[in-house]
Regions:
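Bacterial N-terminal signal peptides that target proteins for export
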Residues: 1-12
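Short, intrinsically disordered, low-complexity terminal segments
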Residues: 2, 21-23
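Bacterial N-terminal signal peptides
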Residues: 11-21
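Noncatalytic, solvent-exposed loop/strand surfaces
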Residues: 25-166
Length: 166
């Protein structure tokens, strides 16, 4: 049983395309603690040990407010939540540390450990988060609120003793 030259060419081209597509796929972290939620990241070219004085500080900011949020990093921004006064804010920074925008997304919790605790979840150009007082919010990468709902009000529920932290 023989294959024609055209069939061989199409088969080899298809296999090479599949192989290069699979191996060229960019690493994307779409879950908490990385792919598979293991906390293990397969990056290469990382330092084997830290310099004695530690890594150099690229930038810092005190403009986000107070809280316990982790950052969410995308290709073009760094997002973090923080409490300012009685409200929770989502702040977007450029990769060089300049504030792009800051958007109020709900009232902060007044319960124990009252500062912001919500780490933004990023998916397809939108950020999802929840305020300390139960406001579930979707914010675009332009800082505009797409939708918001307070689930304590919607479901006639009371706030938990220690507020909300997802």
């Amino acid at each position: 049983m023989f294959m024609s030259a055209k069939t061989k060419f199409l088969l080899i081209t298809g296999l090479l395309t599949l192989i290069f597509t699979i191996t060229a796929e960019a690493q994307s972290v779409n879950e908490w603690r990385g792919n598979g939620r293991t906390g293990i990241y397969p990056e290469t070219s990382l330092l084997k040990s830290w310099p004695a004085a530690g890594p150099s500080l690229l930038w810092e900011s005190m403009e986000a407010g107070t809280g316990f949020s982790s950052v969410t990093v995308t290709d073009d921004a760094v997002y973090i939540t923080g409490r300012k006064g009685d409200d929770d804010y989502l702040t977007a920074y450029s990769q060089d540390g300049k504030v792009k925008w800051s958007t109020r997304y709900g009232k902060a919790s007044d319960s124990n450990y009252p500062d912001s605790r919500s780490t933004p979840t990023y998916s397809n150009g939108k950020l999802y988060l929840v305020s300390g007082s139960g406001d579930m919010v979707c914010i675009g990468t332009d800082g505009k609120v797409k939708w918001s709902v307070n689930y304590f009000q919607k479901y006639n529920a009371s706030a938990p003793r220690f507020g909300i932290s997802e």
